[in-house]
Amino acid sequence: MRSQSFVLSLLLFAVCLVVLSPAFADPTDAAGWVAAGQSLTAAGNYSAGELAYKQALILDPKNADAWNGIADVLNRAHKYTSDPLATMQMALEASNQSLALNASSPIAWINRGQILYNIGYYYQDQLKDPATANMYYNEQLDAFNQAISIDPNNAEAWFNKGYALCGIGRCTEGVAAFKKVEALDPSYPYLQLNLAQAEKLAGVETPFYIQYAGEIVMAVIAIAIAVIWYWAVRRKY
């Protein structure tokens, strides 16, 4: 009985080796290394993620997804480096490479927009250079618009556009972008929080005479009617 159990255990172990070993083996093609890079990046292992993407490029130097992966991982890792701006500039260069190979990827355009935002914020917050910051912020918006032109129903692109618009003081347009996200994906992460904030800021940026135009018109009409009634009554007496 014990011998049978031992044999069954060996067979089960052999089956596990056959089934599971490919999952633990190094990828053998560029697509596999890109997938590995994505998993490592999502797990926060940026150094290993970058190495995986570089391995993909060794196998396929014109792999647009690998270049976009490098752009993404460098953008995420910039705050942990000794020269954040240089790291973000390298991310932007990798984005250039990716889009030169495949300009029809909405994911790559969204990634580019996020890189441009981080560079702009660095110029604004660290270097106190609002003019250069605004240049990058506007380029960021262009990138998100490119993503939307390729995929009009991409909720992530619309969300980032809404965030970008509010960041440059165009919250009324930002509200419209967030409402588009709401129509596409009501459960999009942090949507309601950002929509509420955008609506609040849009109320501040809208002049009161526009914000309350309806009420003002009704008040003017009421006053006009009262004045007409007053003069009509006065003439009788």
Question: Where do the protein language model's features map onto the residues?
Answer:
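Register position in tetratricopeptide repeats
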Residues: A42-A43, R76-A77, N118, D125, ...
